[in-house]
């Protein structure tokens, strides 16, 4: 044992001669490893103070201990009864420490053997040996620290950028999050001062001038209301919350939030009072919290003038106060406790009732102060037509259960007309971030620096929120890691594509799926008293108005996206913090311009960090072009897609160099703006001297083949289903939509051959035979896996048939859609029998649980707890200054039917979310940039092959686990008294075939 201790103490970690050289250790050979004796190092430290070894260092302490042992050794030579021989370990230690007494002599001497240590060491010296062992272990640690200090220091970077640049951008980000409303208010006040000084209105766009005209009277009225609240003359329930922000900020928030709601309200120019009041109230509360924190920070940082604190500091302060309160309570100092609690009262959430009361009062003040009149060129010779910009009305809506009335805020037609030009003047919250988001550490810890950020969008579902809060942090680490990976992907605006979008939009839209910027003219009233003609005219007017509402809504949406793109186009890069829906699917927190959006968004966005294409990257660019061009080309083999792109090189160059002046080939694509971006990228690469070394910023997509059915096929080990959705290798991708369309056509052909006298569907089958194609059934197939009902399928197919205009009679159109929907669902059941049985089993389990008045709960493979939020809603009346509002609140009763029907799709969504997050983590570990859109995974062209390998491996890893068995076991543990049906039978499909399937994601 002692031989081991002695040898271990002297050889441990000193064998790494290369590492030791950093500390001045020389190399020589010995049976104990390679080390320059310790005493030399101690002496050397006195001549080289930079080594940082003080008199009290480990080396000095070991040296002193050895000297102590020397004394024992010398004593033993005089007194042989101690039993310490000349060859003992102590002698060896002594020799080892004296070896380099004369530095530079070159003579290292001879180390003594430890062979007799076991016999030589007496038990009374064990403590000394142990102490040396401990000291040497401490010295090892000091070595490591010292070695790290002596390493050449790498330049520090944060988020891939220098510290100076990061700090500059971080300050800008803090300003964006905390001062947006303040800056907007300041801008209005400066414009008002300019008007007063110059005695004329500034040359502003129409909507900006409207905002400016409303701002001053609204601000003054809010200030007057705040004064009444301060003086105690206002006894409204909202009074305690009404003075927590400056009046000018409340005015700007009220105007912008209401206008934002009107812009996204479906083009009707109206918003429900309860929604508007909640929206405005929440914004006021959030801003009040930030304002309060900043005011405290300004006081504490008055000398430095810096703003470096974040909500993390708030959490630390709260923790400090919590501990202080506990100590005071133990000491029975209740008066001091009450004082602290009173100071912290304003930190409490306001509650839904108070939010809507504050929001209603602000809307009411806006209605009382905001007026509008037509522009000068529209005025007649009469008196000016000044009228309220907003009015409060009641709207009646017919439902299946009867009619309901609710309050709405309706804007004047002149305001509505200008709404789609408003986005550029709006304060848009939750903009993309200039620095990487804060890492997720908990339910409300992560994401934006100051703006309220929650890891899950629970929409008021208390049980789901509590489930996430209760789960151990370690269990959620993979989820945190995946969200951080998605949030740390750096993006930028593709300025070339944005320039083309701006040109098309400025010239009226109508190209590349951009909506027409003009409304459809209303049909003129017929000059007749024929009631049938008048009815037809009214029907047409209704249709045109609906079309114009849809156009208006689309215009507002495009304006919001472009407003963000224009604000971000000059940035080197930006980031999208992500969070989850309750099923565990990840979404960017910014709502407008993000990669989950339309073709317009995806065409405008690209990675901020480029990578050389390489040979495989150029090939994947060509495949990607075929994918976004679509029209069936995306269903060819990879070789066929590459050939398509190579056959269209002339069109690609023309599109890239003269997108609007040339042949406009790119406009024929299904995703035109993504096609244009790809054309530009390919043209740049092929025009460069070395295409393989050209830098590409384009995200290349790999999409699942009807991904929901892929998950069901894996769950059920279903061979037939697996082959239909590319879990099995093939020469070209299997197209499940074409497969279902072929089955539907077979059924209809059989029906068409029957006698129409006996079956009314015969004529419908004959009518529809020429209409059956993959496009007719695609949406129904896609959504069937997520629980589409017969009614949903009927409406989807009816919409497709109506677009084709083959059946003009509405009644016949409806009947044909009914027949086609039934036929499509029959074909689906035949092809995906295993999926249907699993869906039924999931639904049955959910029903059993819900019948006991419990929501369905499960834990995803990544450890995320999920609680289905479907509960019956109770109504709660609340009196506000504007009207009596009905607020909806969850009751204790679950919705049995909804719990049952929603469980299969929600469960599969939680699995596809897990697969995406597992892939994201693995890609990050492999050094790949990664972005994910549910079942579409993106990376640089040069890295697609590696990402493809990873995503297949992660899919197999996911389904190697007994997912359904684990689910059933969790149900049985949670509800031991309930009887659940046995698991459905599964097939013998070998999951590892996925690893060899080139078109699994393609």
Curated annotation (Swiss-Prot):
Source species of the chain: Nicotiana tabacum
Record localization: Mitochondrion
GO molecular function, one term: DNA binding
Similarity comment: family membership: Belongs to the phage and mitochondrial RNA polymerase family.
Active site feature: 703, 778, 935
Biological role: DNA-dependent RNA polymerase catalyzes the transcription of DNA into RNA using the four ribonucleoside triphosphates as substrates.
Broad class of the protein's primary localization: mitochondrion
Protein name, as recorded: DNA-directed RNA polymerase 1B, mitochondrial
Gene coding for it: RPOT1-TOM
Organelle transit peptide residues: 1-21
Record EC number: 2.7.7.6
């Amino acid at each position: 044992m002692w031989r081991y201790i002695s040898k271990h103490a002297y050889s441990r970690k000193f064998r790494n001669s290369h590492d030791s050289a950093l500390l001045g250790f020389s190399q020589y050979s010995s049976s104990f490893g390679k080390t320059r004796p310790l005493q030399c190092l101690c002496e050397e430290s006195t001549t080289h103070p930079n080594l940082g070894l003080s008199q009290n260092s480990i080396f000095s302490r070991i040296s002193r201990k050895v000297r102590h042992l020397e004394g024992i050794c010398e004593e033993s030579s005089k007194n042989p009864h101690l039993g310490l021989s000349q060859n003992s370990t102590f002698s060896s230690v002594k020799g080892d420490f004296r070896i380099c007494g004369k530095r530079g002599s070159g003579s290292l001497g001879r180390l003594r053997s430890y062979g007799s240590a076991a016999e030589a060491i007496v038990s009374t010296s064990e403590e000394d040996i142990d102490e040396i062992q401990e000291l040497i272990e401490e010295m090892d640690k000091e070595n490591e620290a010292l070695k790290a200090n002596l390493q050449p220091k790498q330049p520090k970077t944060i988020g891939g950028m220098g510290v100076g640049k990061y700090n500059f951008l971080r300050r800008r980000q803090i300003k964006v999050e905390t001062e947006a409303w303040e800056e907007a208010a300041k801008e209005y006040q400066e414009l008002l001062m300019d008007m007063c000084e110059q005695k004329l209105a500034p040359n502003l766009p129409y909507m900006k001038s409207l905002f400016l005209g409303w701002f001053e009277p609204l601000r003054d009225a809010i200030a007057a209301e705040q004064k009444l609240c301060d003086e105690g003359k206002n006894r409204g329930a909202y009074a305690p919350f009404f003075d927590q922000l400056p009046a000018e900020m409340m005015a700007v928030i009220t105007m912008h939030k209401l206008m934002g709601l009107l812009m996204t309200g479906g083009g009707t120019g109206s918003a429900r009072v309860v929604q508007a009041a909640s929206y405005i109230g929440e914004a006021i509360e959030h801003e009040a919290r930030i304002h309060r924190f900043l005011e405290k920070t300004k006081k504490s940082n008055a000398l430095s003038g810096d703003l470096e604190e974040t909500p993390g500091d708030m959490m630390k302060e709260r923790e400090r106060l919590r501990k202080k309160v506990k100590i005071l309570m133990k000491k029975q100092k209740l008066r001091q406790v009450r004082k602290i609690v009173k100071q912290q009262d304003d930190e409490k959430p306001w509650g839904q009732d108070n939010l809507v009361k504050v929001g209603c009062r602000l809307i009411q003040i806006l209605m009382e102060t905001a007026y509008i009149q037509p522009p000068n060129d529209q005025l007649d010779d009469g008196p000016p037509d000044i009228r309220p910009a907003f009015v409060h009305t009641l709207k009646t809506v017919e439902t299946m259960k009867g009619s309901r009335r609710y309050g709405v805020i309706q804007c004047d037609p002149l305001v509505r007309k200008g709404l789609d030009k408003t986005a550029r003047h709006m304060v848009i919250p939750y903009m993309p971030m200039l620095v990487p988001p804060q890492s997720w550490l908990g339910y409300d810890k992560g994401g934006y620096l100051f703006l309220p950020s929650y890891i899950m969008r629970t929409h008021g579902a208390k049980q789901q929120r509590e489930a996430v809060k209760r789960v151990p942090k370690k269990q959620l680490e993979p989820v945190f890691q995946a969200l951080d990976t998605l949030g740390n992907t750096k993006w930028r605006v593709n300025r070339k594509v944005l320039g083309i979008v701006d040109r098309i939009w400025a010239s009226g839209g109508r190209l590349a799926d951009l909506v027409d910027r003009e409304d459809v003219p209303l049909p003129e009233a017929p000059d007749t008293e024929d009631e049938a003609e008048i009815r037809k005219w009214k029907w047409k007017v209704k249709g045109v108005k609906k079309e114009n509402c849809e156009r208006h809504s689309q215009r507002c949406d495009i304006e919001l996206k472009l407003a963000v793109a224009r604000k971000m186009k000059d940035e080197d890069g930006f980031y999208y913090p992500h969070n989850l829906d309750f099923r565990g699917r990840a979404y960017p927190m910014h709502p407008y311009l993000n990669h989950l959006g339309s073709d317009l968004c995806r065409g405008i966005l690209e990675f901020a960090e480029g990578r050389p294409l390489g040979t495989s990257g150029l090939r994947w660019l060509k495949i990607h072009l075929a994918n976004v061009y679509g029209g069936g080309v995306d269903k060819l083999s990879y070789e066929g897609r590459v050939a398509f792109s190579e056959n269209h090189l002339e069109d690609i160059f023309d599109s890239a160099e003269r997108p609007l002046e040339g042949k406009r080939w790119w406009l024929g694509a299904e995703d035109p703006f993504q096609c244009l971006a790809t054309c530009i990228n390919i043209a740049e690469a092929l025009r460069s001297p070395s295409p393989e070394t050209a830098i590409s910023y384009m995200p290349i997509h790999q999409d699942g083949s009807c991904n929901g059915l892929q998950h069901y096929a894996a769950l059920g080990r279903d061979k037939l289903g697996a082959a239909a959705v590319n879990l099995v290798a093939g020469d070209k991708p299997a197209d499940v939509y074409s497969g279902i369309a072929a089955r539907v056509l077979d059924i209809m052909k059989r029906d068409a051959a029957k006698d129409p006298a006996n079956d009314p569907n015969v004529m419908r089958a004959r009518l529809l035979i020429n209409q059956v194609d993959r496009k007719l059934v695609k949406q129904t197939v896609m959504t069937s896996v997520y629980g589409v009902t017969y009614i949903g399928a009927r409406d989807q197919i009816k919409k497709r048939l109506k677009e084709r205009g083959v059946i003009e009679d509405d009644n016949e159109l409806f009947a044909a859609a009914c027949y086609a929907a039934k036929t499509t669902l029959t074909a689906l059941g035949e092809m995906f029998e295993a999926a249907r049985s699993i869906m039924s089993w999931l639904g049955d389990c959910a029903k059993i649980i819900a019948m006991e008045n419990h929501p369905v709960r499960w834990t995803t493979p990544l450890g995320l707890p999920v609680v289905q939020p479907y509960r019956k809603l109770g109504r709660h009346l609340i009196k506000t200054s504007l009207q009596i509002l009905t607020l909806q609140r969850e009751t204790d009763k679950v919705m049995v039917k909804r719990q049952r029907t929603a469980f299969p799709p929600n469960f599969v969504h939680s699995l596809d979310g897990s697969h995406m997050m597992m892939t994201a983590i693995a890609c990050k570990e492999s050094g790949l940039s990664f972005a994910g859109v549910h079942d579409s995974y993106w990376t640089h062209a040069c890295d697609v092959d590696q990402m493809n390998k990873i995503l297949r491996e992660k899919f197999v890893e996911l389904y190697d686990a007994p997912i359904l068995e684990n689910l059933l076991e969790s149900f049985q543990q949670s509800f031991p008294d309930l009887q659940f049906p046995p698991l459905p039978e599964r097939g013998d499909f070998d999951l590892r075939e996925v690893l060899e399937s080139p078109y699994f994601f393609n």
